[in-house]
Amino acid sequence: MTFESARPDDFNEIQNLYWDLIDKSKDEPSFPDWKKGEHPSSDFLMQNIANNQLLILRDEGIIKACAIVNSISNKEYANVSWQVKEKGNNVWILHALAIRFEYRGMGLGTLLVKHILSYAKAKNIEAIHLDVIDKNTLADKLYIKAGFKYISTENIFYEVVGTREFRMYEYMI
């Protein structure tokens, strides 16, 4: 299994990974209310691929997991009492972590997060911030297990879900 940045020719496979996951898990209690074509959008995926910010786990030629890390956050992040404050490019935001549907429950989320944390350390990142939508208890468990600290619960507006409660997590590198 390799950890790497996605390439432009990975776009279709990554988009299909998200769309298949949405189709097959939308009725599950922890589903984060992603919508095909809206979140993650094609433009969002392509932009992050172009910037080497879409990270993947590839095994035997198949992308089994992916996530986005960049410094783009929702405006409400500025109101959170983070232990490490953003001052330029010292903090990454973790977005849209997804595991290919048929490979869920195999520890790939944990493996991907561990690789991201190691990569962040190598890039001299001081902290990783993220938010988890109110009902996504599976993501809460993943991030807590990986060492992220719960910071607060905030009302955040995202176009795809409206204003909802999100739990804010931080990992200090």
Predicted regions and their residues:
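A short beta-loop-alpha structural element at the N-terminal edge
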Residues: 2-16
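Conserved GNAT-fold acetyl-CoA-binding loop/helix
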Residues: 23-43
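A short helix-loop-beta-strand connector motif used in the catalytic cores of GNAT acetyltransferases and
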Residues: 43-56, 72-76, 93
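Conserved beta-hairpin
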Residues: 51-67
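Conserved acyl-donor/pantetheine-binding loop and adjacent beta-alpha core of acyl/acetyltransferases
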Residues: 68-96, 104, 159-160
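Conserved acetyl-CoA-binding loop-helix of GNAT-fold acetyltransferases
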Residues: 99, 105-118, 141-145
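Conserved GNAT acetyl-CoA-binding A-motif
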Residues: 113, 120-131
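C-terminal "cap" of GNAT-fold acetyltransferases
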Residues: 133-137, 145-146, 156-173
